[in-house]
Regions:
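Helicase motor core with emphasis on the C-terminal RecA-like subdomain
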Residues: 6, 10-15, 19-23, 27-46, ...
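Basic/polar N-terminal segments that are highly enriched at the extreme N-terminus
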Residues: 1-3
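Walker A/P-loop
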Residues: 49
Length: 367
């Protein structure tokens, strides 16, 4: 599909079925089409993806989208292909035959938007496949991964400036929902987004349809009671977040004992299992998933009616990112933090393990 010279709003209607833009979407799109860099910091559910997808459709050339998660890029590519847009992804989940077919599509120009992780740039066969193409746009999704101050730091994200040079220094747009002032500065500096007429677009953090509450609890039994109550009350999908896999598994056993069906997602599962759980959740109409923070970045499912934190999140950025899964359809959704002061010990131990004192080093040295 090629819609060069089309007005952004016409592309919006033809390809995505909407008649008007939200927030500053059109301003951002026109800024990028004017060959200017951009950093977009805006709440989840506001449609940040359109800010690079529409320029990618309008521009002549190939748009490269860097995304941190394999499952996320698959969801976005599937959605674009359903709308008739020539998009693809290349990642480690593909077999050699499929991967070579997509490299061929890059070389012959039949692919308009390609999604990859930053680690893909280590592969010479990928960079060679791009070598003959005009790169019209580089989009960096979940851009907070660039910064060591960010809650999801990924080392290869810090090399994106090198990768951009390989691509011929195309116009770049970076997007995130969670970036403190320090993280914003890091993103701008690392990607040189202040060059020329680069601009930051900030949409605040307010999500008025999300109802936030904190419930003080004194035991796992009280936590279980709350989770069961929310599951029975709300029609729609829900996520319950846990810090520790062991606690997640304990609650899974308790919920099974109460006849409540659910999925489990955490970093201890094999990649194939994690992908299967995510696909089941994305297809479900009333599905509950118990998860650690390994689940969630980029999850784009409209009808998540509640997000419950069964214990205290590791950071305010993680909390905001995780509750941002809820209510993307604009309908009211409940976000509850179950506060038990004993849970603070878990994070205090994390801090201690990550910042050992001199006595600890001495003990290790003498072993």
């Amino acid at each position: 599909m090629l819609l060069a010279e089309e007005e952004p709003v016409k592309v919006l209607e033809k390809c995505f079925g909407y008649t008007s833009f939200l927030w500053k979407q059109e301003e951002i799109i026109r800024h990028v089409l004017g060959k200017k860099h951009a950093l977009v910091v805006a709440p989840t559910g506001i449609g940040k993806s359109l800010c690079y997808q529409i320029p990618a459709i309008i521009n002549d050339g190939l748009a490269v989208v860097i995304s941190p998660l394999i499952a996320l890029m698959k969801d976005q590519v599937d959605a674009l292909k359903r709308r008739g847009i020539d998009a693809a992804y290349i990642n480690s989940s593909l077999g050699r035959e499929k991967r070579e077919a997509r490299y061929a599509a890059l070389r012959n120009g039949s692919c308009r938007i390609i999604y990859v992780t930053p680690e893909r740039f280590r592969k010479t066969d990928f960079t060679e496949a791009l070598s003959g193409r005009h790169i019209s746009l580089l989009a960096v999704d979940e851009a907070h991964c660039i910064s060591e101050w960010g809650h999801d730091f990924r080392p290869d994200y810090t090399r994106i400036r090198e990768f951009r040079q390989v691509l011929g220094n195309p116009v770049t747009i970076a997007l995130t929902a969670t970036a403190t002032p320090e993280v914003q500065k890091d993103i701008i500096k690392t990607l040189c987004l202040d060059a020329g007429e680069g601009k930051m677009f900030h949409g605040g953090i307010d999500r008025p349809n999300l109802h936030l509450q904190v419930e003080k609890v004194f035991s796992n039994d009280e936590k279980l009671e709350h989770i069961i109550s929310v599951v029975n009350k709300y029609y729609g999908n829900g996520i319950v977040y846990f810090t520790l896999i062991k606690q997640l598994n304990d609650f899974s056993d308790m919920l099974k004992g109460h006849g409540i069906s659910h999925l489990c997602y955490h970093g201890g599962l094999e990649r194939v299992q994690r992908s299967k759980v995510q696909e089941q959740f994305m297809r479900g109409k009333k599905t509950l998933v118990l998860a650690t923070n390994a689940f969630g970045m980029g999850i784009d499912k409209e009808n998540i009616r509640f997000v419950t934190h069964a214990d205290i999140p590791g950071s305010i950025e993680s909390y905001y990112q995780e509750i941002g899964r809820a209510g993307r359809d604009g309908k009211d959704s409940l976000c509850t933090l179950l506060y038990d002061e004993h849970d603070l010990l878990t994070h205090m131990n994390f801090i201690k393990w990550n910042n050992p004192d001199a006595e600890y080093f001495q003990r290790v040295y003498h072993i």
